[in-house]
């Protein structure tokens, strides 16, 4: 439990995290438009500011205790995706349809289906961690270094790349 639980400060931290996160996304979208319109310098400034906003959001999220181990993060991510597809998007689709916005309702439903896939992906990755399968397979597998591209064939990935010494 967060030391801020139940306080106005907790609400403020959550609002700050949400605001900075939304600003980051908006500035990234704005950068795309500026770049398409030929304003490279403005696009670069939007992206730099988006990076700043990302760090601000991370600060508040960490303060709320939102960042854990990879296994904890996968559990939290799966739970968030589950809430989105089982509740949030279903309810939003019902409301949109009741208000006559069928196209938006359909989009909410379609995105909900994607969120279900996200949950399943996170749970599979969590299972891989829990069963020590991230860097091992039951059969010969091609492992490619994500840094230099070295190809290794075997039942387990090397702990470090023999070419560039990048961790597995």
Located regions from the model:
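Non-heme di-metal
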Residues: 1-168
């Amino acid at each position: 439990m967060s030391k801020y639980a139940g306080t106005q400060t907790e609400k403020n931290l959550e609002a700050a995290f949400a605001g900075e996160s939304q600003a980051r996304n908006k500035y990234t979208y704005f950068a795309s438009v500026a770049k398409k319109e030929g304003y490279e310098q403005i696009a670069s400034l939007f992206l730099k500011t988006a990076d700043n906003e990302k760090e601000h959001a991370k600060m508040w999220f960490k303060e709320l205790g939102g960042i854990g181990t990879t296994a904890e993060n996968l559990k939290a991510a799966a739970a968030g995706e589950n809430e989105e597809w089982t509740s949030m998007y279903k309810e939003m689709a019902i409301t949109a349809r009741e208000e006559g916005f069928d196209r938006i309702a359909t989009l909410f439903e379609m995105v909900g289906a994607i969120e279900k896939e996200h949950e399943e992906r996170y749970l599979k990755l969590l299972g891989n961690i829990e069963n020590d399968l991230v860097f091992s397979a039951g059969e010969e597998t091609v492992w490619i270094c994500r840094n230099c591209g070295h190809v290794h064939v075997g039942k387990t990935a090397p702990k470090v790349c023999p070419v560039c010494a990048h961790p597995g």
